[in-house]
Amino acid sequence: VVALIISALIRSLLMQLYVIPSASMENTLQIGDRGAVIKVADFHRGDVVVFKDPGNWLGNETSGTSNPVRQVAEFLGVAPSSATDHLVKRVIGMPGDHVACCTAQGQITVNGQPLDEASYLYSVNGVSVHPSDLSFDVVVPAGHIFVLGDHRNDSRDSRYHLCDAVESGEVAGSGGFVPISDVTGPMVGIFMPFNRATRFAIPATFASVPDPAPAPDQPTVNRKPC
């Protein structure tokens, strides 16, 4: 029993399980999928990450209250988290990255490099959705990331929150960036249902993105969709 408890405690420090609550990451993640997040792993441009709501992105939604047994199981990492104050998106921009939409061909660019997103964007009958119907042009500040859902037409992500109201003294558009300190970790794959079990890899298109300039302390928002 002691060995099982120790094992569970170690697992709780290293890994957390999450249930996907929405369609914003389809087709990569479906509603009800169980994903595994590694808490101690670094993440990179192109990774799928879970993060705490950085600024009322979820509106009035709040975490439900689960029973004590469930809470212990979640803490130990043996039951998927039932919290509703976390989101899952794909990292498009890391600190210093210049992210813009869109080219004449309709592609998002990172540091001037167009992304070929066909491998992960939501698709219907093999036809991917447009990378973004919203125009934006930003430089990601130090200590933050820029995230998008794979189902771009059904995802309230960094694009939308560039238009959020900000506190006095903050740069307009600051609400569109997620503090790295709010990131739980990268989601490494789906473990349930078993017929969808898979391990995630960073899409090949991100390997062509050049290194960014040094990240500014404050975001640069050249264009936002509002």
Label for each model-derived stretch:
Residues 25-31:
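Membrane-proximal juxtamembrane linkers immediately C-terminal to transmembrane helices
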Residues 13, 18-19, 31-226:
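Soluble "head" domains of membrane/secretory-pathway proteins
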Residues 22:
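A short acidic/basic microdomain associated with nuclease active sites
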Residues 1-13:
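Hydrophobic membrane-insertion alpha-helices, especially the h-region
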